[in-house]
């Protein structure tokens, strides 16, 4: 089951549909209702949940024709009843009716990309009813309007806008699944970023250590090295053997190995002298 079908299944079971049935029906019919040559009205559903919904709640006498891809309902109703639904303006209604209308519009012509397995954020409602397009633009301000393959549609392509739409139509299961998936993706990306940063820092450290070691070897093998103080010579040899030691560890080693007590500032002085000689 695709993520889009999951969302439609959740919306089709929303209690608002039953309590605000006329508004929902207007949202659905303004999108896909057709007048047949027989004088009957016809609309299609694409999921078993929608088929069950209309089979149980549709108040008109109807027939069902099923294919491998959809289920087509045909029914008879007075022109007045149908005109009222097709002319319904949800923007003049209260919030529950507006939500039911948008749910109907989405169930009729809406789709959403596979937000759980793709980075492509896209939600749209397609319809050739200009009245419906205008209403949807007013009812959900982030919507943008375009035409694709001679079909009018409204759409959003941002993570936040899709989350807001799910909250508007009360698709809370879909919203939470989408939100959790994004948190997991963001966490994974953050871990990769941290790992890359740690690797970069390690490479810089290794490069610096290698450079320092080469400089130390050159200094130790030079004639000037033997002219330096004994403590400085010892310091250089310790730095060569233990490049990762802190100044405090070197001071402790001096006391343990050479029985020489040297302060931290003394070690810092030797380290500064080494840097100065390397620069020269």
Swiss-Prot record:
Q: What is this protein called?
A: Probable cell division protein WhiA
Q: List all disulphide bridges recorded for this chain.
A: none
Organism, scientific name: Mycoplasma pneumoniae (strain ATCC 29342 / M129 / Subtype 1)
Q: Which HAMAP family match?
A: HTH_type_WhiA
Query: Which superkingdom, per the lineage?
Result: Bacteria
User: One Pfam family this chain carries?
Assistant: LAGLIDADG_WhiA
Presence of keyword Ion transport: no
Molecular function GO labels: DNA binding
Residues the UniProt record assigns to the DNA-binding region sit at: 246-279
Q: Which family does it belong to?
A: Belongs to the WhiA family.
Protein function: Involved in cell division and chromosome segregation.
Q: Which InterPro entries match?
A: Homing_endonucl, Sporulation_regulator_WhiA, Sporulation_regulator_WhiA_C, WhiA_LAGLIDADG_dom
* Key words, A-Z: Cell cycle, Cell division, DNA-binding
One Gene Ontology BP term is: cell division
Q: Does the keyword Cell division apply?
A: yes
